[in-house]
Curated annotation (Swiss-Prot):
Name of the molecule in the record: Lysophospholipase NTE1
Pfam families per record: cNMP_binding (PF00027), NTE_Ploop (PF24179), Patatin (PF01734)
Motif annotated as DGA/G, chain positions: 1423-1425
Residue positions of the active site: S1305 (nucleophile), D1423 (proton acceptor)
Gene (UniProt): NTE1
Enzyme class: hydrolase
InterPro entries: Acyl_Trfase/lysoPLipase, cNMP-bd_dom, cNMP-bd_dom_sf, LysoPLipase_patatin_CS, NTE, NTE1_P-loop_dom, PNPLA_dom, RmlC-like_jellyroll
Binding site for a nucleoside 3',5'-cyclic phosphate 2: 894-1014
Segments carrying motif GXSXG: 1303-1307
Amino acid sequence: MNLTTTMPAAVAPDPPAQLAVSSRSLSDSSDAAGASRTSSSCRASSPSHCPTHAWNPDPPPSSLQPVFSFSPSLPPPCPSPAISSCPPNTLSPPNLLQGIVSQLAMASYIGRLLLYLFQVVPSLLYWAITFTTITVPTALFTLFSMSLTFTMNFTTLLIIVLLLVSTVSWFIRYRFLNIYSRLPPEPQRKEPEIDLFPDSQDGDSKPGLSNYLDEFLSAIKVFGYLERPVFHELTRTMQTRKLIAGETLLLEEEKGFCLVVDGLVQIFVKSIQERDDDRDGWQLDEAVEDSVDEDDEIRRRGHQGYQLLTEVKNGASMSSLFSILSLFSEDIKLRHNEDMESSSSSFNNVPAPDSNPMSPALLLESPTRVSFPDQRDIPTQPSADTLPKVSPLALEGSPGPFEHDPKPRGHRRKRPSRPKRAKSVHPDILARAMVDTTIAIIPASAFRRLTRVYPKATAHIIQVILTRLQRVTFATAHSYLGLTTEVLSIEQQMTKYTSFDLPNHLRGAALDKLKSKFTKEKERLGPEDGTKGIALHNPALNRRRRSSSSLRKDAALHAKLTAVRGKGSASNPIRYGDHESTGVSPGDLLSTIQLSRFGPRYGSERLNGRSVFYDAASGMKTPAGGPPSPLATPGQPLFRFPAQNVTFQRQDSLDQDAIFRESILDCMMKALGLTGSTQDALRKTHNSGDASPHLVSYDSRRQKAVFNNAFGFIDPYDGFGDGDSESLMSMSVTSAGGTSPVHNLRTELQDEIEIVYFPKGSVLIEQGEHNPGLYYVIDGFLDVGIPVNEKGEDLIGSSRRPTAEDILLPITGNASRVSSTLGTAHNQRKKASRRSLYMVKPGGVEGYIGSITSYRSFTDVTAKTDVYVGFLPRAVLERIADRYPLVMLTMAKRLTTVLPRLILHIDFALEWVQVNAGQVIHHQGDESDAIYIVLNGRLRAVLDKGDGKVSVLGEYGQGDSVGELEVMTESTRPGTLHAIRDTELAKFPRTLFNSLAQEHPGITIQISKLIAQRMRHIIDNPLEKGSDKGSPDSAKPTTSTLNLRTVAVLPVTAGIPVVEFGNRLLNAFNQVGVTNGVTSLHQADILNHLGRHAFSKMGKLKLAQYLADLEERYGMVLYVGDTSVNAPWTQTCIAQADCILLVALAEGSPAIGEYERFLLGMKTTARKELVLLHAERYSQPGLTRQWLKNRMWINGGHHHIQMAFRLTAEPVHPETKRLGAVLKQRVQVIQAEIQKYTSRRIRQTPVYSTSTPVKGDFHRLARRLCGKSVGLVLGGGGARGIAHIGVIKALEEAGIPIDIIGGTSIGSFIGALYARDADVVPAYGRAKKFSGRMASMWRFALDLTYPSASYTTGHEFNRGIFKAFGNSHIEDFWLEFYCNTTNISKSRLEFHSSGYAWRYVRASMSLAGLIPPLCDEGNMLLDGGYVDNLTVARMKSLGADVIFAVDVGAIDDNTPQGYGDSLSGFWALVNRWNPFSSLPNPPTLSEIQARLAYVSSVDALERAKSTPGCLYMRPPIDAFGTLDFAKFDEIYQVGYKFGKEFLDRLKNEGGLPIQEETEEKKKLRRTMAPRRASI
């Protein structure tokens, strides 16, 4: 729509005005048209949306002014007369006008921009074209056509060139070649502070206990784990008594278990010389009493002749272990005789002893019963409803035990009619209260009732006490006090109660026939196998190879049915095996003849077509029918037949073997205290078994015995499996059928007895080893003895600290033990002679005490002659003792009878102490009142230096003793002693030591020798424990790996394969060889053994005892934490560990894991080590530092282990897979194995091929934890140190592992190269490259500088070392490494085991004058060889057992000088060049300075040569100089040749620390096989 403006025709504008109007009209027309379109569109769409004003569509023509249409509300028209200032024919509101104006302005800007572009772009294009085509060519043409002439002199030109070269050199030298100086600062890792979380309370007093019951609970721990009913039974009759200060109590008249609730009691014992009236001065020990007035007071009271044994404080027992055994076993018979009938020993009609306590017969036959004036705890009148009927097991009130003994014994009373007061449970013991004291007494009646009601609990308590009696009293007296004769006499005197001869009819021809079988088999085996024990073939063995529990049930039921159906029948049918023969055919293993000869009382045998019964009680044979057999006559020998030729069938031969087995079993059961007279007692035991604690032989599935059978190899232990199921099954059958428990036991054990032949000289039991079982001598003699050099064994001055075996159990002559010491000691050990103690004759039993108590043997038992024995495995004995408590009671009774008086008094004074983790035993500065011997656990002694710093004096594991020096010198404690974990101690009071010193001076001499040996060890090795004073960062972790007994394996976070890691570590332990073996524990093992309530509140006591027994049985226990972080088993692993291995994946996140947080929350002070698992044998530089940076609690170092692992967590107990999944997985495994060998993938990481399995990472870790690490110390000597590489190669070829490396100067360089990859090949290459750089004279010349501090800048030297190590840290090295330096700022020796490797290797190689000192945290470090060039003492302090020390230092010229009292320098110069001079050349100034610098190093070298366990090696490299690096190959060959010769010579001498099995050791192992029950 066009908008036109009407003008009058009369007015005609000029042309320019007309043009302007027209243009404006056009623009206005366009705007109007847009507005019209908007208006029409809005009207079309919606009239309501249109503006209130609009154009008039038909404006009438009027005057000259334009015609407008206004709305009434609009403002007046535009006042401006100019046409351009107001839009024609329209008027907009303010907002509309503003929009129009802004649009017009934008359009104006765009137009101007376009116009500018149209003007500028063409001009730019034009300029560019002209510049490139015209200007530049013109300028170049002009320049090239010019001729310039520069005139300079040579000086100016030289200066310019020098400036240019200097600039380039500076850039390359200081910006490109010194990258090593711009590495981020990584200082040495500061070793963590000692973790000390001790309790405020001390170990003797127990504050916070409010009543006597709490003190009773503390003292009752000696009984071990007690169930609630048993505990209530003991406590319900407990009585208390008040003692005023100074009151004495005659414990000899007390009967019961006494303990101190509150106060202090002194225990006195009668002196041996009490009866000597002519001697005076008997008084209490002044060394114990603090004042003489107290001694005088005691004398005035008439207590002369008594000596102070010990002082008993709160919660401690006044009774000894012996007293407890006496209370339990006071009415048990000592010996069961052969001709004692069961009817004569029946106690069913004997009244309870409580009803008649003063019976003369009772007092007579109960040696430990005492008439007590106070009858509060014993009813004087018979009471039927007070206590239940007395069990026959108590055997109380019976006149039978001694009256029916036809053979006089030494322990019998003279006359049974006169009542005689027997020996008390507290013989010759007197107690005196020092202060007002409250004591508690558990009367003897409580123990008798406990024996009747809970026989199994009683047996369990006795077993615990017997074990502690062995571990505390016997072991201490045997090895610590030197009372070997007294201890070993116990078992010797025990033989009079355990010796039972075989019946006469088993002598003569029967025995000869038995021997002939072994003779034939020995001839068949040959001389080599003849050194082993040969076991007689057991036909029932094939039955026992099946499931034991079902077969036991079948056997018991079959015996029962046989007894019911045919007591008097002839014989049962005989079942033959796969074939039969008509004679004794050695090698016939397939005979499975089943002889049904077990009845309720008799065993029937098929002999020559007749049925003969063997009476188990009397040992006589009677025929089933017909005329009497000659076998029934005692005088006739067995197997004597009529004159006609009688041929034995194979069945008859087996019957003879069965006769021997039955007779041997009868004798063994009598020796154990099980006879037909105890049938009712045993039945009572079975019936009460459910209410008693159930003990399981945890050793039954591990102790495997393999016999060399006369007819093949058999495994007698395959039969039993789980002893619990067998016990319960036989119990149920017995109780159901009413058959004699003894007979059922005999039936079960019939197949367990083995008849074994040992040739002369065979070792049946070895000292220090657990007894394999019980031996009954059929024919021959056994020799029991000890090595004669046992006392002289160097307990301390060996190459290692004393372990449990050294102090408590010196295992001298243990040929089977893999020794890690040198060959000389091994040869002396093999040549050690032995001293015979006594002989075991036919009918005697050996291994009685050790087999039942499961403790190590104090003696070794050998065959004096060719000997035939019956053998019952230890696991079977443990099962018998578990099911029949009378076995333990009988042993307890016999022990209390034969115990020497001296051992008894030691037992009274020795205190069994149990301390919790972190508890302080004594503080620094306390009075030395006792010696502590560690039975179980770990202690740490720390010294408070006063400035807030604490240092460790030592750690003490199982068998170590603490405090002898302080006790003997009566000095104060040098440090604070606290328990790292829950610990059991034997407290040896000073009062006992003083008492024994008066009556037994030999004990004082023994302990004096021990202290002297320790002092000599400290003097000879002053630096072994790291006592060399260095900087804090140079100190090694304060804990020690010596004598570790428990190791826990914990993951850092979930998903780490700790189970697989634990299994591999266990295998490595077994191959390395741990004394007494090693075992691993998982949660499943604990639950299988102790049940699902093992971690309950009550079950923890039982668990603690079980774990303590395991630690006693094995040399190392490995706890694998395979549960969640909050599981009880995880807490148990941490609490029981001497050392904790935190396993982490090296490529994982180094953040703190949840297991570590839990570990820190428990505040354990055990040693903690970090184990990083790598998929490949390579550690990235700086990776280890990331792991250790935030873990200051890692105080035991770290280990790099290569192990292939899965990224996803593998379940501990994987679910059973289907067959298809299993096959698929198997195929995938096979494919992966094939690809492993067919793929040609190039490894980018170093390859380490171990020539022997002992060089693996797990073996290295196992040796580290066992204290058997092999260390390599490399000395300094410049270029002569290249020989180190040859020696290392010789060590690798000899199969000697290297676990720790230490070096000085060039030794630190070579050692670091080898420790980085644990491979000699890359070390050789990098060392040769470095030698090439050092041999370059140009590099040396370019590095020269003004000799203010040194002749060179050290840059080329730094470059050569940095190119060898890069930015690797010492922590990244695969093997543990350290180097030493001399800190001239603080004048001390420092050791470095962390930080950049190149820096500290360079510092250790910094020769003064040639290279400037290295600045490290403000200190100047120089060559470590100035103080110690061969750091053997440092290596020894790290726990290395065997050390190879290679010395390549220069030898000083020691030619005597004679130039006089003054010296002219001119004469010295002339004399040096005078060939005719006879005087030696005096040293130069530099030589004097060098010798002065190495003065302390020479002394350290001499000490290193004499260090025990150090193998000193010095290759012949004296012909080479310090800087002869150009002769690399020659020096390397010299070292390699020397190493080969040295190791070959050492191998021939038997001194190599490797586990090689020579032919001699193989024969020795075969000879020693019987002691491990491998007969």
